[in-house]
Amino acid sequence: YGDIEPFGQKLIKTPNLNRLADDGIKLTQHYAGSTVCGPSRASLLTGFHSGHGSVRGNPKWTNSGNPVDLSTNDTTLAHILKNNGYNTAIIGKWGMAEQVPTNINAMPNAQGFDYFFGYKTHVAAHHYYWPTLFENNNEYKLKDNDYLKNQGKYTHDLFTEKALNYIVKQGETTQANEAGKQPFFLYLAY
């Protein structure tokens, strides 16, 4: 987490991030909840140690035969923020909806996120030219993508575009809202 100036990096100046850190909260005790991505993401979003969470490993199927999905009983950071008036979004790698066909209850929209664009499984996220992403609960086809040949639309570029569009849209929504500003939370997971 030391990649930006508020956390000790001295080479690149980040005055806006410095101000954000000074006016907000610096989270310094959470680097990785696990050695692999699924349980680490679940720990980040639920606050549970990976030993107490529903996602404990990265394999598509556990020894019990059940897929590694985030439990519908888990309260996520997005739930808490949404219940406090935030618009919430995740763009990028979700990696906690492994069932085929998709368990809608494990998708981000059922886990407190108003908007989702990205990979639903951790396996797909290991290929940057994957042919199918998800926008909310719907498949988003990239017909020219071939992950075996690394051809088509580079998904991280698409995530960046979607994230920038989301931020601009939230700014426009805030300006149009006469009652006041609606805060937003964007979880951008490359």
Which role fits each region the language model picked out?
Residues 1-190:
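Formylglycine-dependent sulfatase
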